[in-house]
Amino acid sequence: MHTQPLSRLSIFVDGNNMFYAQQKNGWFFDPKRVLEYFIKEIVPSTLVNAFWYTGLKDPQDQRGFRDALISLGYTVRTKILKEYYDDNSGRYSQKANLDIEIVVDMFNTAAQYDRVVLFSGDGDFERAIELLRSKNTHITVVSTEGMIARELRNATDRYIDLNSVRKYIEKD
């Protein structure tokens, strides 16, 4: 009897983007349950990589959370938040743009996987997703309505709304 090999899966979580999506939805997901669910959901898969990207106020910020992510098997990438002035709103906001780090990790590890789950709604990933798909990589994007760029949704093989998987991944 011939069995099909398991898909090789990599998960990329744009932590800041997902924080706002979860805040909008009024519930938060559990990073451990995310791994467990998507390993089973995206065809039966072997998890080869899981990356989590987040901005920090200072080097000690979110230390406990970051340590927990690492113990679950995530590779955590961080950047210190920078303050920006928004001329339109007249307010300062903080941002740590980790898009380049996400794309670099996607392409640096591309030979290791054939399926990707990207947790982000950022349209800046459109071209990277198109290029990965041209190499026969299956891409699933997870975000929430009203926070996913049309370009990203159109570029992906599959879109999953966070609310549709809430019962599987919500933090207890």
Protein language model features and the residues they cover:
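Nuclease catalytic cores that cleave nucleic-acid phosphodiester bonds
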Residues: 60-172
